[in-house]
Amino acid sequence: MLTRLTRPQALAVCAAPVAALLATAVFAPLPFSVAQPGMTADVLGENKGQQVITISGAPVRKTTGELRMTTIEATSPDTRVNLPQVIDSWFRTDEAVMPRDAVYPSGDDVREIEQYNQKQMKESQDEATRAALTYLGRENEGIDVTLKLADVGGPSAGLLFSLGIVDKLDGDGSGGDLTGGRVVAGTGTIDARGRVGAVGGVPLKTQAAKRDGATVFLVPRDECGEAKAELPDGLRLVPVTTLEGAVDALVALEKGTGTVPSC
């Protein structure tokens, strides 16, 4: 014998599976990582007790000021981010939701990711060294450059490595420092020809830079819009496309002459 359900009973029966589906959807892992401002490091100085840039085969200048490379800190590849976390991070300025594939393009295996990031870092350091020595016209002088930066992977410090090498070897070209005694931060890949490339997480990197005392931030020109959207007060954006352009901009800032590009 069939018993007809009352309207409230029918609604309750229908609501149960719908609620279960919603709960599953809300707490299901999503293909995202949550990132926040990471550490910065002065490439002209030491990081974790080791000199970041060591040069032999040529006189090295004593520098003032700082050139700070910047990073983001993302949830680990095996962390499962759900919808409430995504929504919470979406409305915060100190966090960003990024596709996991953009943060970890090599997959989810932690060891493989570390190897991939270290490979990218080594390639970036080699390119940065070649770019700097070529810019100075000293690529055939037997100058040896060693770059060390513990616990950091990826290619986004390339521009700052090149600038650090230039500052240590040549400064502004007339006896002064590229930084003008300032704390300058930035980000950007670089190739052997000195071309600067875009990176990810720029708004978070500007926050890290401001936190650690920077007043100037070098940004790949293609990412000006993203950098301006959430720019901390007191931080000046300087867009660059090449190593030569970055050096020229810093010299103009230091001397107070010439044109300093802006976003």
Model feature map: region roles:
Residues 2-263:
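Peripheral, non-AAA+ core regions of ATP-driven protein-machinery
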